[in-house]
Amino acid sequence: MVERGLKGVQLIISDACRGLTESAAEYLPEARWQRCMVHFYRNVFSHVPATKVREVSHMLKAIHAQESRDAADRKARAIVDDLRTARMNTAADLVERSVSETLTYYAFPDIHWQKIRTNNPLERIMREIRRRTRVVGAFPDGQSCLNLAAARLRYIVGTAWSTKCYMNMRPLYQPQLMQTEAVA
C-alpha cells in the first residue's frame, strides 16, 4: 500500500501480532501503534481464573476510563499491585509489560478515543466475510474465494453502513490548520 501511495498514516490499530507490528514499524515509521484493547483484555483473561474474569475486566476497563495518559498509567500500576495481591502474577506481568501499548490513543483528540481504542469495525467486516465464505464451504480455487470477498466488500460499501461518518477527522488536523493559518 505504501508503494501505491499510502501516506499520512498517524495510527495503526491491531492485535500484538509480531509480524504486523514489525512491518508497520518498517513501512510506516511515522505512524504510532495502538494495541487493540479488546485483544489485550482477552490475552490477560487467558491468565486469569474463570471465576475472576469479571472482576479483572472491571479493573482493566478502569484503566481505559481515565481522563489522561498519566492517570491511566497510575491506575495501571495500582491494578498490577492488586493482581499481584490476588496471586495472579502472570496477568499482572502481562498488564505491567503491555498496558502502555493500549494507551497510545491518549495522544489523539479525546473525541476520537472511544473509536480508536480497538479495531472492532474491521473485525466486524472480517466476521461478515467469514460468515459468507463458510456458507460456500469449499471453493474451486482461490480466485473464486477472492471474488466472493470482494463482492461482499462492494455490498458493504454500497449500504448505508458505509456512508455514515465514523469519525470527524477535523479535530485531528485542527492544530495543523491553526499553524497553517498563523503562517498565512
What do these predicted ranges mean?
Residues 1-11:
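Short, basic/hydrophobic alpha-helical segments
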Residues 66-184:
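Acidic/histidine-rich catalytic cores and adjacent linkers
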